From Swiss-Prot:
It comes from the Bacteria. This is Large ribosomal subunit protein uL24. HAMAP family: Ribosomal_uL24_B. The keyword Ribosomal protein applies.
Length: 104
């Protein structure tokens, strides 16, 4: 999966189209990412359970994972771009933005 934790992404389809956020968590086996402030859902939490952002029980609003095909990584200029790879001088694989060729 080409999008990792900590990347800035923009939602390119769905109800939150156009929203930008930071990737909180990546789930490569499920091809999903958790983006800050995007795909917020209400979850009913028991009094004893402690979920993300829940201090006590009740109805909690939190982010839900979104499929990786619905987000695009943001390049250094703030535009959505695809991700490519190249090898640097040490032979290490580096992610690059396809739009401008700069490292991500």
């Amino acid at each position: 999966m080409k999008i990792h934790k900590g990347d800035m992404v923009i939602v390119i389809s769905g109800p939150d189209k156009g929203a930008k956020g930071k990737v909180i968590e990546a789930y490569p086996k499920r091809d999903k990412v958790l983006v800050e402030g995007v795909n917020r859902v209400k979850k009913h939490v028991a009094n004893s359970a402690t979920e993300r952002g829940a201090e006590s029980g009740g109805i909690v609003t939190q982010e839900a994972p979104i499929h990786v095909s619905n987000v695009a990584i943001v390049d250094s200029e703030g535009n959505p771009t695809r991700v490519g790879y190249r090898f640097d001088e040490n032979g290490k694989k580096v992610r690059i933005a396809r739009s401008n060729g700069k490292d991500i």
